[in-house]
């Protein structure tokens, strides 16, 4: 009896891996309230028990080495609707993404719900029809494009709970190595497009050159995404960095390049559908297929001029929920947007105990460290909202104002110090918004409000704390990367009045800033 018991336990463990191997069931983290109840998901899809670490299947074929059949969607019903993507590369692993979906679209498929149910209730059955047939997807990673030298492979399930998205971590890879990958519907010839990705160098590896493409601000109705496609076709970079505003939430009436939904987006379905529309752009799809992406969000992934407690068009009052938000609160809207973002983007679970964390760092050998910040949504003090701009100008130097919150700020400063001490030559900082002081009086400012208080200029104490960290520890070779303004800015990083800076030679500066124009 003992061998049989071991076999059954092995089946159970494999079945668990097939479900939990799809990171999106727990995204953005395994233990906070945006994750799904796996007990309910498993029960609905044919599993009789969930004990936390083991699944006991009604059908042993679910967990055998062969392709599962009973209760699963037929391969002929499914399509890889939005290509493939990879992201958040490490020296030994990378995130792989795809979507394997039937041709259905349900604008009621909101996992976050309305009414008097608890805020974090994710039970779907009470509100919408959901599929009881999961999709089984396998993946393989190879050193050659013919997929003949597979070095990592696995299987994962997906379902309507997570918009049929699949996100897995391919492990056991070698540093600074190019790989090819492909998904397929289990037990069939229904395959995804072939993707390509690349791991990062080992932290102490000597690397002479790493090429990155840096993007921000891509608004689908306002132009084609040629910038993505040109770099992909030239094929002369290693990775892609996106600094935010990957989508825009606005209502649009564009007929030449319509986006779905056409109204301003608020619900989980809205955000899923909007990202899905963007991913139909062939240049964007090609870039995702060719390169590993590292992304963060700015404001428009959720809503314009976002901060900790609201947005320019929606605040934390019941009247605003009803008048401006289609009955959707600030917290609800943020949950919807964050969940859709983690479902659709090739991004890792960053922190298992942090509801909104996207800030993280990457090491590219001894050449540079990349620090990706969230200067927008995590714990930002109030920003300019249109009606309060002059008031915010009066607060520019207030010591308590922060773009990041104390937790992220302290982490950021520690990252700078650790990077310098480990001997990394450069530090790249993805900060979304422009860091350097810019007088915008002749642009769209005024004599009374001469600075863009929605950028770092509106949070002078936070800027000064950043510069103080750099100067106190002698941390130079810092490169700030920014988007948001839709304009190109290049400047030295200088703590004015605290350093002997020469604008002719650049001496006294601790780095430079490159703020790029928009994709569209």
Please provide the spans of the model-predicted regions.
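Metal-dependent phosphoester/phosphodiester hydrolase catalytic core
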Residues: 18-520
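Fungal secretory targeting signals
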Residues: 1-20
